[in-house]
């Protein structure tokens, strides 16, 4: 499976744009329409597998909630474990947490303390990269637990929102399958 213009266009075209959601002036990129298209979903996972196979990853970490939809099948295809990062109070075992800033306020993410080991090489995945705050907090959690994380993958990137620069400053290599500029 080759990451070419046609396959990337199929993925991008499967993502619906919803104007003025969740508030006026926002163009929401709805990845659930990609999930409804089995060809686009299979292609998305296949391209990610092709890109990341044989690189020695031991875990895929996906962020709540849409990161789970891409991270779990990716981990399964790579033959490695999947680790969810969740909002507070959603994980049953002992956790550590990391706060991060949102446009209007802050939020918190948690991970099980026994989910990542010092010898783990971790790939982080989410559906969309905007400001980078969620992935920055996720990477901090992984590094607190001693894991090595240098790669992050996204289906969608909104480059005008500054997330790419923010994450590259954390020494992360990034890939995204499609970009929506000017949003």
Swiss-Prot record:
One of its GO terms (cellular component) is cytoplasm. SUPFAM superfamilies: PRTase-like (SSF53271). GO terms for molecular function: adenine binding; adenine phosphoribosyltransferase activity; AMP binding. Pathway: Purine metabolism; AMP biosynthesis via salvage pathway; AMP from adenine: step 1/1. It catalyses: AMP + diphosphate = 5-phospho-alpha-D-ribose 1-diphosphate + adenine. Catalyzes a salvage reaction resulting in the formation of AMP, that is energically less costly than de novo synthesis. Homodimer. Belongs to the purine/pyrimidine phosphoribosyltransferase family. This is Adenine phosphoribosyltransferase.
């Amino acid at each position: 499976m080759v990451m070419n213009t046609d396959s990337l266009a199929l993925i991008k075209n499967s993502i619906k744009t919803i104007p003025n959601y969740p508030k006026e002036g926002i163009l929401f990129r709805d990845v659930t329409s990609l999930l409804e298209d089995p060809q686009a979903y299979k292609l998305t996972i296949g391209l990610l597998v092709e890109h990341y196979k044989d690189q020695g990853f031991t875990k895929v970490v996906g962020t709540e909630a849409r990161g789970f939809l891409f991270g779990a099948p990716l981990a399964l295809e790579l033959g490695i474990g999947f680790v969810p990062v969740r909002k507070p109070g959603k994980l049953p075992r002992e956790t550590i947490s990391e706060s991060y800033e949102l446009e209007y306020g802050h939020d918190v993410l948690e991970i099980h303390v026994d989910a990542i080991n010092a010898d783990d090489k971790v790939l982080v995945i989410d559906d969309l990269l905007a400001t980078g705050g969620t992935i920055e907090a996720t990477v901090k959690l992984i590094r607190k637990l001693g894991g090595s994380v240098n790669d992050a993958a996204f289906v969608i990137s909104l480059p005008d929102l500054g997330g790419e620069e923010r994450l590259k400053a954390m020494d992360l290599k990034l890939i995204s399958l499609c970009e929506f500029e000017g949003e």
